[in-house]
Amino acid sequence: NSAAVSDALKYALRECIEILGNEVIYDMKTRQGIDLSEHPVDAAELTLECLRYMYRFLFMLFIEARPELGYAPMKSQTYVQGYSLEGLRDVCERVRESSEVVSEGYYIDDTLKELFHMTYYGYPEGLDDYKKAIEIEKESMHDAFTMEALKAHIFDPEYTKLITNARLRNCAMLQIVDLMSISRPANAKERRGRISYSALGINQMGAVYEALLSY
C-alpha cells in the first residue's frame, strides 16, 4: 500500500544520497582532478544538493505516474523512450547485468540531465518556440511533445552545482535507479517488485520529503 511504499522510500533515499555524494567526490578527484586536501568539499552543501537532487528524482517519478497532472507527456513515445524516468527504469532493468563498459559510461546521468533541463526550462525552450511546437504537434502526425517550464527550486541547476558539474557513472546511477524502482521484500517469502508511484498520494510525498529534510 501507499504507506508501505513511502516508508520503504525513506530508507532507499538515504542510501541514494550516500551513493550520489560519494560519486560526486569520486568524479572531483578523478575526472575533474581536484585536490580535495587543498580544496575540501563543503560536506553540508554537498549533502543538501544530494537531498535536492533525489527529491527532484522522486518528484519526476511521481508526476510521470500521474499523467493527469499535465506535466509529463507520457502519451508521447518519443518522450517515454528517449527521456522519461519510466523509460530509464526499463533500460536499467535490461542492462543491470551488462559489462564494465556499460557501468563506466554516463548514459543514465546524461539522460537525467536532459530530462531535468527540459522540466525546468520547458521544451521547446522559450514561449514563442513552445507555441510553435504546439501548432506543429496539432498539425503533424509525428510523435512530437511539449513541456511547460516547471520553475521550481528543486529543478533549478543553480541549486545543484556540484552535481551538475560532475559526470556520474552508470555503476552508481544504476544503484540509485534500482533503489528507487524495486521494492525490498519484508521477508524471505516475498519477491522484489517494481514500485508503483501512482499509489503515492500528496500526503505520502510530504512524509517522504520530511524524512529527507531530517536526514
Language-model-derived ranges and their functions:
Residues N1-Y215:
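Preference for the N-terminal adenyl/adenosyl cofactor-binding alpha/beta module
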